[in-house]
């Protein structure tokens, strides 16, 4: 998650008397909450009590007198760095103190009272699931409510997550972000004030070996099946005509497990696909389509001659990556403390081991750069869990004073319709992709992005290349 405080506001108190400075905290470029300095100071003091002063980053000190515009700007920058440092710390960023502070602030900022509401959550194929939740329910609460509605066992809930998406005209989803523990899903989706934004349930792991755990259960099997059919229909999974025929035959026989077994062998099975964007690979300003999955980032690009090619970047060969944000300066080329900002430009850059002893930066410019970074981190986390012999099965916390809330009524996951015939353009694209070798990974210069613009994510799953790989 990318935390920023891009602007401040001068606001009046509840009584309409004295004014105060409000700091607008954004997550992934969208307003999350509006807080005062005193509220952030209270958070800092609470974290210091729980974890000690040595663990915490520096916090801007109190001032006896009113701040000048320049001092407000300086404090904004210091608070932004503080919030980013706390969030990136594994201990502090996952603490209930930090997350509950952000949830309360989000609810107060949007002025949403705590009450029971009906929240619509979509499955990957568009099926609607209505759950009764509180407006103050956090992400895990809503996920549990959806699981209860579908009768998904508790020990399989950890295999799924809720995602905030924007529904496009063709029915496909453009992923905004995975909903986090510091936000309230109802408030997050309604505060955007657009019917395009939805909450979607989707599997949250990358390694298809975990499918076996989910497929043991009827509901889990149906969820995977519905997601896979949807991904094929939208062209996320690459399918030839013959493979499409085999899949449709298995559908007609209602052989869901066999359908999934075949789908697992297909290119881009289980991948998340992003909107078209721009990369500096294999040349500057190259239009690409990025997909994430199977411990890699895939870049599909069309070269001169209309040939579609694919470059695959393994996460184990990424030494580190960073997300940078920049805002064009207003006309005149100077920044002012007024905090008036234009559209944010986001870039994901990763340092890749192209060959033995040769690292090279690759940069992707996309509004979804932060989501791509989150995918990289979750793939690394999953690799580390598997390497240590751990499991992603999630034993849910029990609430104080009782068991998990269960739904009064349950809803079955409907089987999606049979696959439609693939269009000709998609078929030709698959043929080219399967026959041509990967694009050259040589001759690309390092980007001019300023590394100080954001934190660099080190990769604990980074591996060297042996002679046998060359």
Curated annotation (Swiss-Prot):
PROSITE patterns: PX, RA. InterPro entries: PH-like_dom_sf, PX_dom, PX_dom_sf, RA_dom, SNX17-31_FERM_F1, SNX17-31_FERM_F2, SNX17/31_FERM, SNX17_FERM-like_dom. A 1,2-diacyl-sn-glycero-3-phospho-(1D-myo-inositol-3-phosphate) binds at residues 36, 38, 62, 75. GO terms for biological process: aorta development; cardiac septum development; coronary vasculature development; endocytic recycling; intracellular protein transport; kidney development; receptor-mediated endocytosis; signal transduction. GO terms for cellular component: cytoplasm; cytoplasmic vesicle; cytosol; early endosome; endosome; endosome membrane; Golgi apparatus; protein-containing complex. Residues 401-425 are annotated as: Disordered. Residues 115-206 form the Ras-associating domain. The modification Phosphoserine is found at residues 407, 409, 415, 421, 437, 440. Residues 270-432 are annotated as: PTB-like F3 module. It is a peripheral membrane protein. It is found in: Cytoplasm; Early endosome; Cytoplasmic vesicle membrane. Residues 1-109 form the PX domain. GO terms for molecular function: low-density lipoprotein particle receptor binding; phosphatidylinositol binding. Residues 115-432 are annotated as: FERM-like. Keywords: Cytoplasm, Cytoplasmic vesicle, Endosome, Lipid-binding, Membrane, Phosphoprotein, Protein transport, Transport. SMART domains: PX (SM00312). Pfam families: PX, SNX17-27-31_F1_FERM, SNX17-31_F2_FERM, SNX17_FERM_C. Belongs to the sorting nexin family. Monomer. Interacts with APP (via cytoplasmic YXNPXY motif). Interacts with KIF1B. Interacts with the C-termini of P-selectin, PTC, LDLR, VLDLR, LRP1 and LRP8. Interacts with KRIT1 (via N-terminus). Interacts with HRAS. Interacts with ITGB1 and ITGB5 (via NPxY motif). Interacts with CCDC22 and CCDC93; the interaction associates SNX17 with the CCC complex. Interacts (via C-terminus) with VPS26C and VPS35L; the interactions are direct and associate SNX17 with the retriever complex. Critical regulator of endosomal recycling of numerous surface proteins, including integrins, signaling receptor and channels. Binds to NPxY sequences in the cytoplasmic tails of target cargos. Associates with retriever and CCC complexes to prevent lysosomal degradation and promote cell surface recycling of numerous cargos such as integrins ITGB1, ITGB5 and their associated alpha subunits. Also required for maintenance of normal cell surface levels of APP and LRP1. Interacts with membranes containing phosphatidylinositol 3-phosphate (PtdIns(3P)). The PX domain mediates specific binding to phosphatidylinositol 3-phosphate (PtdIns(P3)). Required for association with endosomes. The PTB-like F3 module within the FERM-like domain mediates cargo recognition via their NPxY sequences, while the F1 module (Ras-associating) is responsible for interaction with membrane-bound HRAS. This is Sorting nexin-17. The lineage of its organism: Eukaryota, Metazoa, Chordata, Craniata, Vertebrata.
């Amino acid at each position: 998650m990318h935390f920023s405080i891009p602007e401040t506001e001068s606001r009046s108190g509840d009584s309409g008397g004295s004014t105060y400075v409000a700091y607008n905290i954004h997550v992934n470029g969208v307003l999350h909450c509006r807080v005062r300095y005193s509220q952030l100071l209270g958070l800092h003091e609470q974290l210091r009590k729980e974890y000690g002063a040595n663990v915490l980053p520096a916090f801007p000190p109190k001032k006896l007198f009113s701040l000048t515009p320049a001092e407000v700007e300086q404090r904004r920058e210091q608070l932004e760095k503080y919030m980013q440092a706390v969030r990136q710390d594994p201990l502090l960023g996952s603490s209930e103190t930090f997350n509950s502070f952000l949830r309360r602030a989000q609810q107060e900022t949007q002025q949403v009272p705590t009450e029971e509401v009906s929240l619509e959550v979509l499955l990957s194929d568009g099926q609607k699931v209505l759950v009764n939740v509180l407006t103050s329910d956090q992400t895990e609460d809503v996920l549990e409510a959806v699981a209860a509605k579908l009768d998904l066992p508790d020990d399989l809930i950890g295999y799924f997550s809720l995602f905030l998406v924007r529904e496009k005209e063709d029915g496909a989803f453009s992923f905004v972000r995975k909903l986090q523990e510091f936000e309230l899903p109802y408030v997050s989706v309604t505060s955007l004030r657009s019917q395009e934004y939805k909450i979607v349930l989707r599997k949250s792991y990358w390694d298809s070996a975990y499918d076996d755990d989910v497929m043991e259960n009827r509901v889990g099997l149906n969820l995977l099946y519905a997601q896979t059919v949807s991904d094929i229909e939208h062209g996320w999974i690459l399918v030839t005509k013959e493979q499409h025929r085999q899949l449709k035959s298995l559908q007609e026989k209602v052989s869901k497990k066999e359908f999934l077994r075949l789908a697992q062998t297909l290119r881009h099975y289980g991948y998340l696909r992003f909107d078209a964007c721009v990369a500096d690979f294999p040349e500057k300003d190259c239009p690409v389509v990025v997909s994430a999955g199977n411990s890699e980032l895939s870049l599909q690009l069309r070269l001169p001659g209309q040939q579609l090619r694919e470059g695959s970047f393994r996460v184990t060969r990424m030494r580190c990556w960073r997300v940078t944000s920049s805002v064009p300066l207003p006309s005149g080329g100077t920044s002012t403390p007024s905090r008036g900002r234009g559209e944010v430009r986001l870039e994901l850059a990763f340092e890749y081991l192209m060959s033995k002893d040769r690292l090279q930066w690759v940069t992707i410019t996309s509004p979804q750069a932060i989501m791509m970074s989150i995918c990289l981190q979750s793939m690394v986390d999953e690799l580390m869990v598997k390497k240590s012999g751990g499991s992603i099965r999630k034993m849910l916390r029990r609430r104080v004073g009782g068991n998990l809330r269960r739904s009064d009524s349950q809803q079955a996951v409907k089987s999606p319709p049979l696959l439609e015939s693939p269009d000709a353009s998609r078929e030709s694209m698959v043929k080219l992709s399967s026959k041509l070798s990967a694009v050259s990974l040589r001759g690309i210069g390092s980007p001019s992005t300023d590394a100080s613009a954001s934190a660099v994510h080190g990769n604990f799953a980074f591996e060297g290349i042996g002679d046998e790989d060359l």
